[in-house]
Amino acid sequence: MDTDTSISEDLKLAVLEKIKPTEAERKELMAVQDELAAEVKAAAEKLCVSDIFVKMVGSAARGTWLSGTHDIDVFISFPEETSRKDLEIRGMGIAREVAKHAEYAEDRHAEHPYLNIVYKGFDVDLVPCFRVCSACQLKSAVDRTPFHNEFIKSRIKGREDDVLLMKQFMRGGRVYGSELKTQGFSGYLTELLIIYYGSFEKTVKAASSWKPGKKIDIMQHSELEHSEPLVMVDPTDPKRNVAAALSLDKFCMFIDHCREFLKSPEIKFFFPESPLPIEDKEFLEKLESRKTSQLAIVFETPDVVDDVLYPQLYKMEQAASSLLSEYDFSVIKTGVWSGKPQTVVMLELISGTLPNVKKRTGPPVWVREHAEKFKDKYEGAENVFGGYIENGKYVYEVHRKYTTAKGLLEEQLLNCSLGKQVYQSVNKGFEVIENAEICRLKDQDFRVFLRKWV
């Protein structure tokens, strides 16, 4: 592979033309940020809350936001000695006062509550935090964010375009976003990669040769060993891995994306074509071509945020696969899709049916005690077809309890280890549909997922 392939300035400029905020966008963002800061201060004064600082953080504050994204993070910091209870009561009080001027508001919860609002078309998080003196002495996880902000702002000047290119490139490779649904690269991690390697081009070339266990320590101050595929030691906290949320698959998808791009640098790596929803006819043709069994477990989507939902869905996906394997069904792959109102866990099997007979092999005949116990268990039992000795061991052919994957899932799924909210939803009712029956699911986003699936 030729890693010396140059990435043309024309290509980078063509991408930046689509993703770099215009002067009008920047002015609007700054005006809204100023308004929000004034609203927070006015709310604090109205509620007689003193000694709070307002700080804009995140990509909007650092000049590394993509055109068309309207996210603002407003941190309301309280003195370090403030109790957690006071922080929540007074911080959320200020946030709710600001929300009176918003188009929409929703309480959310990370380590402690914060408020998400839509204000003049911008998606805004109002986050109370403690004003600690060091990112190594946190009282809550969000307290480190202002330190991240200062570190990036002091080093990113002149490289903002490289960050924008990298973010869009990662989006094109479906690896951008550190939320638990995606398990990819966070914005902060992306910025640190650009700071460390120096440019978009250098980062892509370096990443094309990464291996699991890659470690980057900008400040050379790491204090702990980490086991994740990529370790980016937090410059503000030597014990923390910024890339902890990055899964092995997304790490490897990024490596592959970089390699393919370097072979032939094209705009499609930034803006891939969006797949169309698959139609019934094409799906049925794919089924006929694959000659496998497709199963879909369908249930009502739990009313929880994605960071709560998706770990539970991945847990259910694994539990269903393990259950099928335990009963001798061969699982090819699994996947999850979630929308409103339904969630679907997909499973592809070599076959959805098994014969009535199952072979049970016991210990060698000469291991007398165990061999006789095994023989006594099966000899003459009504669910046994017959027995014989093979390779010196007792063998009995018995009736298989579950001969269809669908029947097994219908009877045993609720006995699997499922997350709390997913279990509650599945317990209300679920359906297992297979093969051509899956055409009953008409949601267009699901049909896009289904196209990728087959």
From Swiss-Prot:
Question: Which leading EC class covers this enzyme?
Answer: transferase
Which sites bind CTP?
S59, R62, H148, K167, Y176
Q: GO biological process: any one?
A: RNA repair
Q: Tell me which residues bind ATP.
A: S59, R62, H148, K167, Y176
Annotated SUPFAM superfamilies: Nucleotidyltransferase, PAP/Archaeal CCA-adding enzyme, C-terminal domain, PAP/OAS1 substrate-binding domain
Entry GO MF terms: ATP binding; CCA tRNA nucleotidyltransferase activity; magnesium ion binding; tRNA binding
* Presence of keyword Kinase: no
InterPro entries per UniProt: CAA_C, CCA-adding_arc, CCA_tRNA_nucleotrans_2, NT_2-5OAS_ClassI-CCAase, NT_sf, NuclTrfase_I-like_C, Polymerase_NTP_transf_dom, tRNA_NucTransf2
Reaction(s) catalyzed by this protein? a tRNA precursor + 2 CTP + ATP = a tRNA with a 3' CCA end + 3 diphosphate; a tRNA with a 3' CCA end + 2 CTP + ATP = a tRNA with a 3' CCACCA end + 3 diphosphate
State the UniProt keywords alphabetically. Answer: ATP-binding, Magnesium, Metal-binding, Nucleotide-binding, Nucleotidyltransferase, RNA repair, RNA-binding, Transferase, tRNA processing
Q: Look up keyword tRNA processing and say if it applies.
A: yes
What cofactor is this protein dependent on? Answer: Mg(2+)
Q: Binding residues for Mg(2+), per the UniProt record?
A: D71, D73, D125
Q: Supply the EC number(s).
A: 2.7.7.72
Q: Read off the NCBIfam families from this record.
A: cca_archaeal
Function per UniProt: Catalyzes the addition and repair of the essential 3'-terminal CCA sequence in tRNAs without using a nucleic acid template. Adds these three nucleotides in the order of C, C, and A to the tRNA nucleotide-73, using CTP and ATP as substrates and producing inorganic pyrophosphate. tRNA 3'-terminal CCA addition is required both for tRNA processing and repair. Also involved in tRNA surveillance by mediating tandem CCA addition to generate a CCACCA at the 3' terminus of unstable tRNAs. While stable tRNAs receive only 3'-terminal CCA, unstable tRNAs are marked with CCACCA and rapidly degraded.
Q: Please report which protein family the annotation says this sequence is part of.
A: Belongs to the tRNA nucleotidyltransferase/poly(A) polymerase family. Archaeal CCA-adding enzyme subfamily.
Subunit structure of this chain's protein: Homodimer.
Instruction: List the PANTHER family.
Output: CCA-ADDING ENZYME
Q: Give the note.
A: A single active site specifically recognizes both ATP and CTP and is responsible for their addition.
* Identification of the protein by name: CCA-adding enzyme
Q: Which organism is it from?
A: Methanosarcina mazei (strain ATCC BAA-159 / DSM 3647 / Goe1 / Go1 / JCM 11833 / OCM 88)
- Which lineage ranks, top first, belong to the organism behind this chain? Archaea, Methanobacteriati, Methanobacteriota, Stenosarchaea group, Methanomicrobia
